[in-house]
Amino acid sequence: LVDAPGVPVVHAADYLTHRDTLLAAGHITVVGSGQSGAEIFLDLLRHRPTGREQLHWIGRTPAFAPMEYSKLGLEHFTPDYTRYFHSLPENVRDRLTDAQWQLHKGIDAGTLSAIHDELYRRTLNGDWPDTVLTPGVRVRTAGRIATTRIELHLEHIQQNTRTRLTTDAVVLATGHRERPLDRILAGLDPYIRRDNSERPRIDEHFRLVLDPSVTATGCNVYVQNAERHTHGVGAPDLGLAAWRSATILNTLTADEPYHLPTRTAFTTFGLEHQPHH
């Protein structure tokens, strides 16, 4: 669809390049309920005539929800939480990764307020804006109708219902796919220990868990931003980069050139082994 002539289907990263073409389209659908999707929907809304907006905004998340910015909430991005997450069973970690979407896929509260204010302003004349905002929806398939329209096959995750949406343009604010490590680590593949989902196992020091025949030689492979499944939501967070790097260097040198604090959060994640009396 992206390469189809006459059918504007663009990724959010290219939105500004194609903005004029999108604004000229009759009906526009924004797919994606994160910050990019929200900003694009707001921009389109502000530049469409009142009562003739013809905008759909859909996303897979259960709600158009704000990003978790509270100070205690942000303690999920600390070494304390990273260590706690790593200690959990694999199936629990996987459930948490999906459940914690609001820690990194939410929307700035100011943007949500601006969208609501703009929609409300358009009701002051007694009408209702021609917009549809529906969370909890995934796009199953998509195809062209004739040469200038697009049909999206939608499924509501909670209702388990399906429908079709015909639109003139689509903006895909769906993020970027993480690149798999397989090609980079192809030479090591026979030696990499994997979890139940065939993902590389990574220890608490950010080392790939390799066959003992490799580690016995003193060889190790360290990774950063490839360990969300083992270290949690903070894996790609730049705020933890210095701590990750220091952890790796301390392990490499078998010394402690970088002194790291033993506690970094006021929250105690999990029950302590020795209860307080």
Locate the predicted segments by residue.
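Flavin (primarily FAD) cofactor-binding/catalytic cores of flavoenzymes
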Residues: 1-35, 39-277
